[in-house]
């Protein structure tokens, strides 16, 4: 524990030097009157992470890494037309052969947004408008559980295609989306470790689409400030020599009922979805058998915010994501997390993050608090496999006989953020613990020890 604290202190010092240099560097202004408005935005972030103990298969010992991420973007607008562009530079240092490093952590100097946007009137009523965004872009919709522009992860995922966003004066929103995935390059471990610069490329054989509608204040006579949402998302993949895939062909309909937290009132967030379609067991070229897919996901959270200066809130939560019951049949019933987020609902990610919405049954409780310049939360989950014969996904551990049981373990997750300079410089500290349950201790290939401890210190400077 002392070694972990010393590592975090060193990481905080590195982050401070890096962040201060960015925050107090030259500012870019775009306030001069002009026919063309130029909005410039950016951030530079430094994060040191330390992990004591391992839960992933084939990894052992302690780990650490120092991650840097810099974003710089601009949008030029003339009337109803806009052009947008954003660069991302994501790098890793202090890692070693035992670090589970992939291109989800490193993507040195690449374009994540290059788009044209056109604003037009909409058919959803007086005052409604539609933004038509065409090109390479990042996407977040609603709860971000289906598709998210990640915040905590070191690399932001991009897509290329069309995203139409219709909004109304009363707060309704309609999203229409059809995009191809962008492959983060390089993908080989040696190039990732070296922070090599390789241009990302579109994967035209992997397409993602969606329709998502939100009705604001949908039940005013019954309960004010309740949002109702309905959506359907889909994935279509085909194999190519350059990009082998499991040939996913999914449709995922679902819905959400949501009431935002506010002082002295009850809030809730219930979202569920069903997934139908087919896929193959692997991405191998000789795997040509399609498996039927029928999977489900549900999260339900009920909270209450007390009427106090720092807005303390307590919430109960349950997260379910189905698992595959029989590894030998012609079905695949695991609910895969594809492009949505998991940190906001479950745990810190990056070098840690044992929980993901796939083969999961996890009741939990969380406490939140926030004031003008700081916010904090602590979250506890008692995590089990939804199917004890399916995989503990992040750890890549599986007992197809089910003899190891289903209880993965106890997860405690914390985070605190403080604005050193409001809107310009933010410090974030976090820690997590994963105490192994019977499955994680007894499964074939089980990790050494009985727990993992994780901590990080992060400094972000904003333009």
What does each of the following model-derived ranges do?
Residues 47-67, 443, 447:
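Surface-exposed strand-loop-strand hairpins of Gram-negative outer-membrane beta-barrel proteins
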